[in-house]
Amino acid sequence: MLYQTLRTSENYSSILRHRLSTNPSTAAEPWTILIYQDGVDPSDGLAKQHSRKTVVFYWSFLDLGPAALAHEQVWFTVTVARYNVVMEVPGEHATLTSMVLDQFVGDDGTNYFADGASFQLFDGSSVLIYARVNAILADEPALKEMIACNIV
């Protein structure tokens, strides 16, 4: 998804290039991958059944900065799952969270961005991005579900 977006979106490529010039991504100082989880319920708020309620995970680079992160265009969707299906999975949200985090590491635990990942930008130039998952953003109920614990 990132590969395709950088090649086809002039705006996203420009944002990324600018941030890399002001805050380089290096092996010694990799960028932070931010995971964001939110519940989405498109049904009527007064409905008794909320069968369309979903759990959505997104990701972006924290290093893009708050101005960029305020726009949905810099967030990538990792997965969308029906809430009622998630509740049937052993471990529920914690299992889904683990599966999402697995998308950023190989079966042997290797971080895909640890050695740098090369991408071609819209203008044809290339960049190397080092990054690691190092931040999770969610409201308190979502955090509770994601780590499967009681928050008092």
Residue ranges and their predicted role:
Residues 1-14:
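Low-complexity, highly charged intrinsically disordered N-terminal segments
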Residues 11-152:
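Domain-level cores of phosphate- or acyl-group-handling catalytic modules
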